[in-house]
A protein has these predicted regions:
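N-terminal segments that cap or nucleate solenoid repeat domains
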Residues: 20-24, 28-93, 204-209
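Processing junctions and N-termini across compartments
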Residues: 6, 36-37, 56, 155, ...
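Glycine-centered beta-turn/loop sites at beta-strand termini
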Residues: 41, 55, 64, 73, ...
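Leucine-rich solenoid repeat scaffolds
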Residues: 158-207
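Sec-dependent, cleavable N-terminal signal peptides
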Residues: 1-12
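Cleaved targeting-peptide boundary
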Residues: 13-21
Length: 210
């Protein structure tokens, strides 16, 4: 069944879907390979917390490398840049800003209020708890708000957005799909997007992004 949801400044297609349909729709949507420490491209994965050389931390600024980095923040308010490579970032419990570089990245804000901006490639952007601002990029992006009140802003590529628990704002552009939209909880939409009515689906569990 296809309905048209009318809102101010919004044209939204409202779709009925279940877990099987979502799995078929988004299967292989992302090409985010697991980062397993395998030697490639002339360097090893770098892990900040293990003291591996390459990643630089100066005060509250962390800059990655051209390798497939694994970067872990702490309780400070940090600014984290990844460069080339398929990177994973866990920002920690501060109010952090993450800038994703080239490659397919997994960027986790974790706790408190974060801003996450991915670069090129297919990216998973997860705000965690706190009032977060999540951006889509040029490629295929999955934005997950998590807990609290989040703002999810689509990029120019194909973007799937799940606000999670809280009152969320979805800013749609390009080819955007919104999951678990619930205006009764204060969710709002600006722009043009498709809404999949699948309340109760855990997007990080039920959609294959491998």
């Amino acid at each position: 069944m296809l309905l048209i949801l009318q809102q101010q400044h919004t044209n939204a297609q409202f779709l009925q879907a279940d877990n099987d349909i979502l799995g078929d729709t988004f299967k292989n949507f992302f090409n985010l390979n697991p980062l397993d420490g395998i030697f490639k491209s002339g360097c090893w994965d770098s892990i900040l917390t293990s003291g591996t050389s390459g990643i630089k931390k100066t005060g509250h600024l962390i800059v990655g490398t051209d390798c497939d980095d694994k970067i872990r923040g702490d309780s400070a308010d940090e600014v984290i840049y990844t460069l080339k490579g398929n990177d994973q970032v866990w920002a920690g419990s501060g109010n952090d800003i993450i800038y994703g570089g080239m490659g397919s990245n997994r960027l986790y804000g974790e706790r408190n209020n974060d801003i996450i901006i991915p670069g090129d490639g297919s990216n998973l952007v997860d705000g965690g708890s706190g009032n977060d601002v999540l951006y889509g990029g040029v490629g295929n992006n999955l934005l997950v708000g998590g807990r609290d009140n989040d703002q999810l802003i689509a990029g120019t590529g194909t973007t799937i957005m799940d606000g999670g628990i809280g009152s969320n704002e979805f800013d749609c552009s390009g080819n955007t799909i919104v999951i678990n939209y619930n205006p009764d909880y204060g969710d709002t939409i600006a722009g043009n997007c498709k809404i999949v009515n699948n309340m109760g689906i855990n997007i990080t569990r039920d959609i294959d992004i491998s």
